[in-house]
Design a protein with these regions (language model features):
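SAM/dcSAM-binding transferase cores
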Residues: 112, 128-177
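A generic structural signal for alpha->beta connector loops
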Residues: 11-13, 35-37, 92, 118-120, ...
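The AdoMet/dcAdoMet-binding core of the Class I SAM-like
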Residues: 1-88, 104, 129
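Residues that form generic nucleotide/phosphate-binding pockets
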Residues: 48, 117, 149, 153
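Low-complexity, flexible helical/coil segments
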Residues: 27-30, 49-54, 92-100, 131-135, ...
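Residue-identity detector for glutamine
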Residues: 29, 52, 87, 110-112, ...
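C-terminal substrate-binding/active-site "lid" region of AdoMet-derived donor-dependent transferases
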Residues: 69-75, 79-143
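Generic alpha-helical propensity signal that fires on short helical segments
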Residues: 32, 56-58, 77, 113, ...
Length: 177
């Protein structure tokens, strides 16, 4: 995540929270020049966020748990964490959720109550992936504006995804049958 952020001009500190420090150790080992930009805490994400003395401009839920040869979103990502993220965002803040459908391709029923927490939201579809990036907050740019900005940023990064994204207002839509 750091390489694209730095290439796009980000120069802040990122707080990363995980119960398993292996990913951060690998990051620090292979990207030592960027390690100072990440403040890692080994903790439960809910406990950590609830205990923070400040609110945030941006919060990202990328929580997933390995199972067999796959990964899934634990229940806490659909229930407790979204409302806590909503509470800890500044009024102009943005929440980004990396959502994964169930094995059937359907979205969990917990998605509906989660989406009611935010007055404005958009979903980013990356054609090469099953997950959806759900962006939420009090006010967001129109999907066309967000799509233009996102494509432009991806082009600056020379990412093939620049031409493979679609954006629509609202939460992820049910799988078409």
């Amino acid at each position: 995540m750091m390489a694209p952020l730095l290439k796009l001009g980000f120069n802040g500190i990122i707080d990363a929270v995980d119960l398993d420090p292996v990913g951060h150790r690998l990051f620090a080992q292979h990207c030592p020049g960027w390690a100072d930009s990440v403040r890692f805490t080994k903790a439960d994400a809910v406990d950590w966020l609830a205990g923070q003395p400040r609110d945030f401009d941006l919060l990202i839920d990328d929580l997933s748990v390995p199972r067999d040869d796959d990964v899934f979103k634990p229940d806490i990502s659909w229930t407790v964490l979204p409302s806590l993220i909503r509470q800890r965002l500044r009024p102009e803040g943005t929440a980004i959720f990396n959502l994964l459908p169930e094995k059937t391709g359907a979205w969990p029923e917990q998605l509906q109550p989660m989406t009611r927490l935010f007055p404005s939201s958009q979903t980013v579809h990356l054609s090469d992936f099953l997950n959806r990036i759900w962006i939420a907050g009090n006010a967001l740019p129109r999907p066309a504006t967000l799509g233009f900005r996102l494509r432009h940023s991806l082009q600056r990064l020379e990412s093939r995804q620049a031409q493979r994204i679609r954006i629509h207002s609202g939460p992820p839509r049910p799988k078409r049958t």
